[in-house]
């Protein structure tokens, strides 16, 4: 959540880490889409979310979308039997990530187990069966795997006698 909050911070541009806030907007779009929809491809019909990372994405996304609906800064769009989430106000969504981050920090610092349980179980476990069927149908039509992965290359440094790196090969 710290990264989500800071993805829309001008300081990242100042530090040269991103060129503009479009990077943050894309990350917000991706995070909400994944937490609300895409990760459901990994579950069978009727399953609850059990994996910790999936629960985390789900409860953060569901909480933010629920709060955002109050002032229409994220709209749920249903068109031709498909559900989409459209962020209308990225600044407000950033504020919501900040509010949730503050609450999580409070929970951690006070050891408030019941509040943590309420967030995870209230927002991160149950799956809307209609949305789930929709996601599975859409994914099946695309014929793509429900998981992505990374291949980490082995990098080998060539150094001089003082240890300075001269070259790196794969």
Regions found by a protein language model. Name each.
Residues 1:
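Active-site recognition of the HExxH zinc-binding catalytic motif
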């Amino acid at each position: 959540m710290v990264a989500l909050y800071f993805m829309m911070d001008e300081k990242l541009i100042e530090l040269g880490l991103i060129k503009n806030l479009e990077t943050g907007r894309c990350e917000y779009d991706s995070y909400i889409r994944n937490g609300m929809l895409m990760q459901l491809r990994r579950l069978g019909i009727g399953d609850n979310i059990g994996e910790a990372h999936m629960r985390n994405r789900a409860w953060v996304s569901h909480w933010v979308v629920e709060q955002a609906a109050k002032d229409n800064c994220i709209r749920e769009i249903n068109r031709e039997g498909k559900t989409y989430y459209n962020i209308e106000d990225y600044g407000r969504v950033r504020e919501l990530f900040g509010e949730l981050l503050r609450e999580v920090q409070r929970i951690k610092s006070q050891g408030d187990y019941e509040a943590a349980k309420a967030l995870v179980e209230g927002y991160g476990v149950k799956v809307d069966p209609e949305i789930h069927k929709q996601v599975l149908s859409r994914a099946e039509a695309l014929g793509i795997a429900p998981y992505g992965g990374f291949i980490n290359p082995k990098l080998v440094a060539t150094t001089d006698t003082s240890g300075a790196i001269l070259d790196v090969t794969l």
